[in-house]
């Protein structure tokens, strides 16, 4: 049965500044570039076998994926559905703002010109369904924290508060199996 590995991009400038990045195209910091290299080395050292790396077109994820691909020798291609959620009016605002936290409780909210969590889930679930239909295939997805939440929710039931609280560190590697078990 196929697997999916998920890697969150390396540290970005707005991660350091504690700002909501969302669909805004913010670059990696030098630390982020180092994290990407270390993650590629970790994937190679662990002997993770994958057919392909799929990555978000936003530069922080694309640069992370390219570094991993260079080190592992795996083919990599852009997958637009892995773009981070557009948080509309909240982009570039403090990540820990109380108003934003309340806004996230409404999964149908498009954040004043952004994208609702339900729309994000639709595109990510469609991608994962396509990958699941290829049972002998394993992919590494390189994307964003918001996308990590949706991927996790595909493989595991979560309450709304668990979903909102779930987070992945920069360049953390998660493993999911289509046999129904998150590892």
Segments from the language model and where they lie:
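Active-site-proximal alpha-helix that buttresses catalytic centers in soluble enzyme cores
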Residues: 2, 7, 11-74, 115
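A secondary-structure boundary/capping signal
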Residues: 8, 78, 143-144
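Glycine-rich, flexible loop/turn motifs
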Residues: 16, 22-24, 78-86, 107, ...
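Short aromatic-enriched loop/helix-cap "lid" or pocket-rim segments at secondary-structure transitions
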Residues: 16-19, 65, 88-92, 154
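Short beta->alpha junction loops/turns
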Residues: 25, 58, 83, 144-145
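Short beta-strand scaffold positions
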Residues: 55-56, 122, 142-143
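Phosphate-handling substructures
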Residues: 68-125
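Active-site-adjacent alpha-helix immediately C-terminal to a catalytic or transition-state-stabilizing loop
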Residues: 70, 125-182
């Amino acid at each position: 049965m196929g697997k999916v590995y998920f890697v969150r991009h390396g540290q970005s400038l707005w991660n350091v500044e504690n700002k909501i990045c969302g669909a805004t195209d913010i670059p990696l910091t030098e630390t982020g570039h180092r994290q990407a290299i270390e993650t590629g080395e970790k994937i190679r050292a662990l002997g993770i076998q994958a057919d392909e790396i799929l990555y978000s077109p936003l530069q922080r994820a694309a640069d992370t994926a390219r570094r991993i691909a260079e080190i592992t020798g795996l083919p990599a291609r852009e997958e637009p559905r892995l773009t981070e959620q557009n948080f509309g009016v909240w982009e570039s605002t403090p990540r820990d703002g109380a108003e934003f936290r309340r806004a996230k409780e409404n999964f149908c909210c498009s954040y004043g010109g952004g994208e609702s969590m339900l729309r994000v889930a639709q595109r990510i679930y469609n991608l994962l369904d396509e990958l699941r239909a290829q049972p002998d295939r394993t992919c590494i997805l390189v994307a964003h924290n918001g996308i990590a939440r949706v991927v996790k929710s595909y493989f595991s039931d979560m309450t709304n508060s668990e979903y909102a609280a779930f987070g992945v560190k920069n360049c953390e590697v998660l493993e999911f199996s289509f046999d129904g078990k998150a590892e």
